[in-house]
Amino acid sequence: GMIERMKAEGKRSPADIVLTVDISRLSALVDAGLTQQVTSEVLSKNVPNKYRDPAGHWFGLTTRARIIYASNERVKTGDILKYEELASPKWKGKICIRSGLNAYNLALTSAIIHHHGEDYALEWLRGLKQNLARKPQGNDRAQVKAIWAGECDLSIGNTYYMGKML
């Protein structure tokens, strides 16, 4: 992957700036010693503290929302409002999702752990697994397509995929 390539290239790497999809990859770059501290008045002024590394190794330029997609034919507005509700037995056999090892789902699970603790997150994951309509497969677009095909009623995906699919 990218980290291995940058390590192999060393000082010969043509990369000056790395744009990547989530915080875990930024953290891996820092841990691998592939970043350097940046001091920028413009970035410091325009990027809030919560979206930048305290040591100045990275600045977040955008955020993405991971949302719950729902069939507008089979799920009433307001029936599900929070990720936590995905573990409710109400949704047994109704959820499609991509692999839990996907970076986006790992980030969501990390957020659940951060907000509720490891014990809660483990129970949430168990409940979510019990509610799957099928074995995790495909990408975010495949989950939305599965809702349209009637395979499931709910899925999780990044917001921008819907716009790309319209």
Q: What positions do the PLM features span?
A:
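Charged, often glycine-rich, active-site loop that binds/positions anionic groups
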Residues: 7-11
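Short beta-strand scaffold positions
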Residues: 20, 156-157
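A beta-strand-loop signature enriched in Asp, Gly, Thr, and Trp
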Residues: 158-166
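Extracytoplasmic ligand-binding site segments that recognize negatively charged/polar headgroups
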Residues: 1-4, 14-151, 162
